[in-house]
UniProtKB/Swiss-Prot annotation:
Self-association state and partner proteins as the record states: Monomer.
Binding locations of [4Fe-4S] cluster 2: 157, 161, 164
Cofactor: how bound: Binds 2 [4Fe-4S] clusters. One cluster is coordinated with 3 cysteines and an exchangeable S-adenosyl-L-methionine.
EC number assigned by the record: 2.8.4.3
Gene Ontology cellular-component terms listed: cytosol
Binding site for [4Fe-4S] cluster 1: 12, 49, 83
Name the record gives this protein: tRNA-2-methylthio-N(6)-dimethylallyladenosine synthase
The organism's place on the tree of life at top rank: Bacteria
CDD domains per the UniProt record, alphabetical: Radical_SAM
Domain MTTase N-terminal: start-end pairs: 3-120
The TRAM domain, residue ranges: 378-441
PANTHER family in UniProt: CDK5 REGULATORY SUBUNIT-ASSOCIATED PROTEIN 1, MITOCHONDRIAL TRNA METHYLTHIOTRANSFERASE CDK5RAP1
Cofactor(s) essential for the protein: [4Fe-4S] cluster
Length: 474
């Protein structure tokens, strides 16, 4: 009988990436297969997020539900990971006796050993340390699940914005060696991945060691990734304005694999609030970055993060945010009402903005960005868009679903053979969360760069010419 693993994930794409690595790790080394049903599992893992308010209470509510399963099956192992685990540590075990393992984002690679410790009778195994980049050296080879993949290039953040817990829960910035990243992406490309999304709390702060002891910047890494055979699209998430330097902007000018869509959090359009948030830049500096970006890549679309109702935010501050939204023309946003995170400097500030006022401001902001996004979508009507086909449509499995460069989902009628490839579609209808397309042409009719994967090269016949030069021929 196979051993079953159930993972519940909350939070950002970094957490999604970490959860996939947990599944790979326990699958390869201990033979666990994933199950969607917690009641079927031998191990339950909760990968937590501490960004939003009441994150801890959400964790304990979930653990209360899992406790009933452990009462029925005392051999069930329950683990809590992620940022709440880093923040709370042993306090989780003190409050939820059913928990066996507590681990942080930087120690998930030690899960097999921690599970064995529990099986040997240890009551609580806790490791929420920050062993820098060690976890990437201990994880199994990457496994592709479709034509797109996330690849973590760094961990942590050293910016210490006054509202943010990330430096305390994931540690300071640590970059993976560039060779390791390039190898991982090349392995994914060999498995059919066409688009990679480079992940980190602040990817443009990336400074990774190279094989010869030099330092690879984020701009250089982008160019290296673009040169990998089979990789035709590159995205990255997320960035900080103060390190969005000119060399990164220059990549947009000469690297078509880098998509014409950027998520660049600003949080507020008010200089006074940006200073209180310790963001390290003013609104005009953010606008300067976007102006230079649009000069390098005409038509690039921008999304952002906004915090509404930060302590001391006045109506004038909020008006500055709305003006920035209109000036930039944001296409999308992740926007939230401010909630104090324990241990952050902003948590000590008096929260003097009325909750009803916060809700009203949030509704105004979201409505403004929704209007702008719909306007962009309508401009796409009648145009031909190149999309990467990711799989069947969510609502109609008889149709296909793909994504444009500017991150819009397109549903269309097509053949299953197109999954994992690029197709051109004409946009014929616009909805709030998706577009409707009509198939125009497949990849075999496009003038795409022909990539040779390592297996294809090795499959060719080796032959030396009269000068002794080795050639590989079909």
């Amino acid at each position: 009988m196979s051993k079953k693993l159930h993972i519940k994930t909350w939070g950002c794409q970094m957490n999604e990436y970490d959860s996939s690595k947990m599944a790979d790790l326990l699958g390869e080394y201990q033979g666990y297969t994933l199950t969607e049903e917690a009641s079927e599992a031998d191990i339950l893992l909760l990968n937590t997020c501490s960004i939003r308010e009441k994150a801890q209470e959400k964790v304990f509510h979930q653990l209360g539900r899992w406790k009933t399963l452990k009462d029925k099956n005392p051999n069930l192992i329950i683990g809590v990971g992620g940022c709440v685990a880093s923040q709370e540590g042993k306090a989780i075990k003190d409050r939820a006796q059913c928990v066996d393992i507590i681990f942080g984002p930087q120690t998930l690679h030690r899960l097999p050993e921690m599970i064995e410790q529990v099986r040997r009778g240890e009551k609580a195994v806790i490791d929420i340390s920050f062993p820098e980049i060690e976890k990437f050296d201990r994880l199994p080879e990457p496994r592709a699940e479709g034509p797109t993949a996330f690849v973590s290039i760094m961990e942590g953040c050293s910016k210490y914005c006054s509202f943010c817990v990330v430096p305390y829960t994931r540690g300071e910035e640590v970059s993976r060696p560039s060779d390791d990243i390039i190898l991982e992406i090349a392995q994914l490309a060999e498995q059919g991945v066409r688009e990679v999304n480079l992940l980190g709390q602040n990817v443009n702060a990336y400074r990774g060691a190279t094989h010869d002891g030099a330092i690879c910047t984020f701009a250089e890494l982008l160019r290296f990734v673009a040169a990998i055979d089979g990789i035709d699209r590159i995205r990255f998430t997320t960035s900080h304005p103060i390190e969005f330097t000119q060399d990164i902007i220059d990549v947009y000018e000469d690297t078509p694999e880098l998509v014409s869509f950027l998520h660049l959090p600003v949080q507020s359009g008010s200089d006074r609030i940006l200073t209180a948030m310790k963001r390290g830049h003013m609104a005009i500096e953010y606008k300067s970055i976007i102006r230079r970006l649009r000069k390098a890549r005409e038509g690039i679309q921008i999304s952002s993060d906004f915090i509404i109702g930060f302590p001391g935010e006045t109506k004038e501050d909020f008006a500055d945010t709305i003006k920035l939204i209109e000036d930039i023309g944001f296409d999308h946003s992740f926007s939230f009402i401010y909630s104090a995170r324990p241990g952050t400097p902003a948590a000590d500030l008096p929260d003097n903005v009325d909750m009803e006022e916060k809700k009203q401001r949030l509704a105004i902001l979201q409505d403004r960005i929704t209007q702008q996004a719909m306007r962009y979508s309508r401009h796409m009507m009648g145009t031909v868009q190149r999309i990467l086909v990711e799989g069947p449509s969510v609502k109609n499995p008889m149709e296909l679903r793909g994504r444009t460069e500017n991150n819009r989902v397109v549903n269309f009628e097509g053949q299953p053979k197109h999954i994992g490839t690029f197709v051109d579609v004409e946009i014929v209808d616009v909805y709030t969360n998706s577009l409707r397309g009509v198939f125009i042409r497949g990849e075999d009719e496009m003038d795409l760069r022909r990539s040779l994967r390592p297996a294809e090269i090795l499959a060719k016949r080796k032959q030396d010419d009269e000068l002794g030069v080795t050639q590989f021929k079909p």
